[in-house]
A protein has these predicted regions:
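C-terminal motif of bacterial Sec signal peptides marking the signal peptidase cleavage site
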Residues: 4-5
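N-terminal segments that cap or nucleate solenoid repeat domains
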Residues: 10-55
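Ankyrin repeat A-helix N-terminal signature
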Residues: 22-27, 55-61, 88-94, 121-127, ...
Length: 211
């Protein structure tokens, strides 16, 4: 069903579009619900290319995001730096919003400005529950970004080796990550773990057949 079929404007009044984005920033659900049936366009963008849902997602305004998503906001609409509500929620560990985007058509193959899926920054930033959620959703485990790194490599190279990163490495291995997929310089996940003294991660990789 299109937005026009729902009674939402196809282009929108600029003043009301601005008001909708402001309401999203303030987590003002009542105002969002007041604006949408009138002349606000749900996916109208500001100068940064951000929709109201993108703004709500950045602020982790769960109620505003829910109202917008339920009204048909595009969870894959990218801003000027190639972030979408889905990708941003995954990268930042905004789990509740991420789950809503997954339930409303998130494009699992979409990538950010670094050519990475949502799983890669989630792993790099230590968001354990987010990694679990994205794996369960079916995001490609061994996707390689523009830097030549996978989620497994980023969890090791850019993490600190503590418990949350140990858990993420375990989750990725259990999901079938290629433990021998090296970076562009030919350095393997095992070599990166050894170089950083991450013994627990090293042992997990060895147990999974890393070389």
């Amino acid at each position: 069903m299109t937005l026009s079929a729902c009674g939402y404007a196809s282009s929108g009044d600029p003043m009301h579009n601005d008001a909708l984005r402001q309401a999203a920033a303030q987590n003002d659900v009542a105002r969002i619900e007041q604006l949408l049936p009138k002349t606000a366009q749900i996916d109208a963008r500001d100068s940064s290319g951000s929709t109201a849902l993108m703004i709500a997602t950045r602020a982790n305004n769960i109620q505003a995001a829910q109202a917008l998503i339920q009204a048909g906001a595009d969870v894959n609409a990218k801003d000027n730096i190639q972030d979408s509500p889905y990708l941003y929620a995954g990268a930042r560990g905004h789990l509740e919003i991420l789950k809503m985007t997954l339930q409303h058509g998130a494009d699992l193959k979409s990538t950010n400005r670094y050519g990475g899926t949502a799983l890669i920054p989630a792993a790099e930033r230590g968001h354990v529950e987010t990694v679990k959620t994205l794996i369960a959703a079916g995001v490609k485990i061994d996707h390689v970004n523009n830097l030549g790194w996978t989620a497994l490599l980023e969890a090791i190279m850019l993490g600190n080796g503590d418990k949350q990163y140990q858990q993420i490495v375990d989750l990725l291995i259990q999901a079938g990550a290629n433990v021998n997929l090296a970076d562009r310089e030919g350095v393997t996940p095992l070599a990166h773990a050894q170089a950083r003294g991450y013994k627990t991660i090293e042992n997990a990789l060895l147990a999974a057949g890393a070389k």
